[in-house]
Design a protein with these regions (language model features):
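Active-site-adjacent structural segments surrounding the nucleophilic cysteine of cysteine proteases
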Residues: 16, 30-94, 98, 119, ...
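Compact soluble domain cores
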Residues: 101
Length: 193
């Protein structure tokens, strides 16, 4: 069996069933909340870090609730990832919707602003004591592998994040921007009123 995909420019590509199944398998394996990091923070760099942000290791598909719990507890709102997931986790999406990431902290009395960020803004917020939740995409081609993480610091070479099961992991600026730009630099700033 062959599947035929037609594109707007009238070109047609033929993908054999084995190739289609391979793409489907890759899509399945690259699920929401995939976490990738570059490793430890380089020792020789001057790091700017907000050190007292609570860390919650994420469970499967729970990067949104884990990220929100860390930032909200930083602002002294006592919630757990499980509390948050009960209210905003979507089983059908196997994750958390972006809009729910904004609405949930607002319902708990915090200011939550979602916008398209940049590195300068990210650094300014970290310097001011505001951790940011960012939405990145580790996927390739048409396959998305979305993930929320908390930016807790930076240095001249990259960012320091709480992501997945990793607290304070370093990601080079180049790698970070490649994944962040795929989401149009989705950024969530949460702060007290």
């Amino acid at each position: 069996m062959r599947l035929k995909f037609q594109f707007v420019n009238k070109q047609a590509w033929i993908i054999s069933m084995p190739a289609y199944l391979f793409l489907a398998l890759i899509s399945f394996l690259l699920h929401s909340c995939a976490a990738v990091s570059n490793g430890d923070i380089p020792e020789s760099r001057q790091n700017r870090i907000i050190s007292n942000i609570p860390f919650y290791a994420q469970e499967d598909y729970q990067c949104g609730p884990a990220s929100l719990a860390g930032v909200m507890n930083y602002w002294k709102i006592d919630v757990t990832p499980d509390d948050i997931a009960k209210e905003i986790y979507s089983k059908s999406a196997k994750g958390t919707l972006n809009i729910d990431m904004v609405i949930y902290p607002q319902r708990k009395g915090l200011i939550a602003e979602q916008y398209s960020g940049n590195m300068q803004d990210l650094k300014k917020n970290i310097d001011s004591g505001y951790p940011l939740i960012v939405f990145v995409d580790y996927g390739f081609w048409a396959v998305q592998s979305n993930h929320f993480m908390v930016v807790v610091g930076y240095n001249e070479d990259g960012v320091i994040v709480n992501s997945g099961k990793d607290k304070g992991k370093f990601i080079s600026e180049e790698d970070f921007i490649k994944t962040w730009e795929k989401t149009k630099f989705w950024t969530l700033l949460i702060k007290r009123k």
